[in-house]
Amino acid sequence: MNHPAARLDARLAPRLAERRQAGLYRCAEALEDYDGATAVRSDGQRCTVFCGNDYLGLAADPRPARALAEHARRQGSGAGAAHLVTGHRPEHEALEAELAAFTGREAALLFSTGYMANLGVVTTLVRRGQAVAEDRLNHASLIDAVRLAGGRPRRYRHADPTHLAQRLDDRAQLVVTDGVFSMDGDVAPLPELAAAAEATGAALVVDDAHGLGVIGPEGGGSVPATGCAPERVPVLVGTLGKAFGTFGAFVAGSRTLIDALRQWARPYIYTTAPPPAQAAAALEAVRIARAEGWRREHLQALIARFRSGARQLGLPVPQPAGPRTPIQPVLVGPSATATAWSAELDRRGLRVAAIRPPTVPAGTARLRVSLTACHSEEDVDRLLEALAAAARQAPPTLEAPS
């Protein structure tokens, strides 16, 4: 037991056992042969996937894959260095230019992940002790970013501009919010949040990971979808691994903002640049997403079908106002109930992950249904039937808010 690894394991084992006992233990299963809507499980059975983020079905589209293969042959499998050393390539510059144009901003900067992009933004713009207002349901990366920056978080009630205004004063530097909230699928009231921020001189930062490509004209995201002018959101964060089906993230804004991030954003400076071939694939995916509006139209039709069916069946699915997103949570309450529902759906060949604490508050465990443009009406109907069966077997104890 004197071995360092054994001592470390001895400290970790009780924590892992406690997590298993609480029904919160997590594990990953390798799925194969993903085609945008279905995949093959580890037991060899094909299942329909309703819990991914590939909203437009571009992860399995052959065109970004061809771009990736072509540029990998020309540029190799990796960048070989950080952007500011020798890792920056023409593919990165082309993608940044496309993203700036797509979002209506002067410039954009690539990051390896959305988590790193949020860390880079907040740690660059906030100094230790400065106040930052944040929605209480923000993504973990935004919450962690404020902590790591040494900022003083001022949380306001979810999507509540009035409470935000009460929490703000002229010492607050930033207001940070998700554009589309990843666990509830609702959209932030951006014009009202912007007005509250502007009243005290704070800058509004929007992480639109789940909105870009999906809602708004040409998939422009939550900013145009809510009627908010781009200049009222000085900092926009987006990801490339969700609606665009590839990998990576970016920040879009003024040239001055992007220059500042290039100088001081440690997650950008101290990491290897994304593979150039990956940037080429993302560029192709963004162009496809902008051009092929039928993907969003079909997706919206599926969302409407699911919401209508859930309402008719009495399923606990929230029906919030505002733009409709592919994230449709089915609220059940206890973690054990969510796990039982997920297992029943899995038995029927439908993969929907149970979302449990600490990802969501205690007592609000759910199945987070995510629809994609590759699903069919028949897929949605089969999902609704399975959810109704799961509800009969293990009734939910949490009613969905209206």
Swiss-Prot record:
<feature type="modified residue" description="N6-(pyridoxal phosphate)lysine">
    <location>
        <position position="242"/>
    </location>
</feature>
<dbReference type="InterPro" id="IPR050087">
    <property type="entry name" value="AON_synthase_class-II"/>
</dbReference>
<dbReference type="InterPro" id="IPR004723">
    <property type="entry name" value="AONS_Archaea/Proteobacteria"/>
</dbReference>
<keyword id="KW-0093">Biotin biosynthesis</keyword>
<dbReference type="GO" id="GO:0009102">
    <property type="term" value="P:biotin biosynthetic process"/>
</dbReference>
<dbReference type="InterPro" id="IPR022834">
    <property type="entry name" value="AONS_Proteobacteria"/>
</dbReference>
<dbReference type="InterPro" id="IPR001917">
    <property type="entry name" value="Aminotrans_II_pyridoxalP_BS"/>
</dbReference>
<feature type="binding site">
    <location>
        <begin position="114"/>
        <end position="115"/>
    </location>
    <ligand>
        <name>pyridoxal 5'-phosphate</name>
    </ligand>
</feature>
<protein>
    <recommendedName>
        <fullName>8-amino-7-oxononanoate synthase</fullName>
        <ecNumber>2.3.1.47</ecNumber>
    </recommendedName>
</protein>
<feature type="binding site">
    <location>
        <position position="26"/>
    </location>
    <ligand>
        <name>substrate</name>
    </ligand>
</feature>
<dbReference type="InterPro" id="IPR015424">
    <property type="entry name" value="PyrdxlP-dep_Trfase"/>
</dbReference>
<dbReference type="GO" id="GO:0008710">
    <property type="term" value="F:8-amino-7-oxononanoate synthase activity"/>
</dbReference>
<dbReference type="Pfam" id="PF00155">
    <property type="entry name" value="Aminotran_1_2"/>
</dbReference>
<feature type="binding site">
    <location>
        <position position="139"/>
    </location>
    <ligand>
        <name>substrate</name>
    </ligand>
</feature>
<feature type="binding site">
    <location>
        <position position="182"/>
    </location>
    <ligand>
        <name>pyridoxal 5'-phosphate</name>
    </ligand>
</feature>
<comment type="pathway">
    <text>Cofactor biosynthesis; biotin biosynthesis.</text>
</comment>
<dbReference type="InterPro" id="IPR015421">
    <property type="entry name" value="PyrdxlP-dep_Trfase_major"/>
</dbReference>
<keyword id="KW-0808">Transferase</keyword>
<dbReference type="InterPro" id="IPR004839">
    <property type="entry name" value="Aminotransferase_I/II_large"/>
</dbReference>
<feature type="binding site">
    <location>
        <position position="359"/>
    </location>
    <ligand>
        <name>substrate</name>
    </ligand>
</feature>
<comment type="similarity">
    <text>Belongs to the class-II pyridoxal-phosphate-dependent aminotransferase family. BioF subfamily.</text>
</comment>
<feature type="binding site">
    <location>
        <position position="210"/>
    </location>
    <ligand>
        <name>pyridoxal 5'-phosphate</name>
    </ligand>
</feature>
<comment type="subunit">
    <text>Homodimer.</text>
</comment>
<dbReference type="InterPro" id="IPR015422">
    <property type="entry name" value="PyrdxlP-dep_Trfase_small"/>
</dbReference>
<keyword id="KW-0663">Pyridoxal phosphate</keyword>
<comment type="function">
    <text>Catalyzes the decarboxylative condensation of pimeloyl-[acyl-carrier protein] and L-alanine to produce 8-amino-7-oxononanoate (AON), [acyl-carrier protein], and carbon dioxide.</text>
</comment>
<dbReference type="GO" id="GO:0030170">
    <property type="term" value="F:pyridoxal phosphate binding"/>
</dbReference>
<feature type="binding site">
    <location>
        <position position="239"/>
    </location>
    <ligand>
        <name>pyridoxal 5'-phosphate</name>
    </ligand>
</feature>
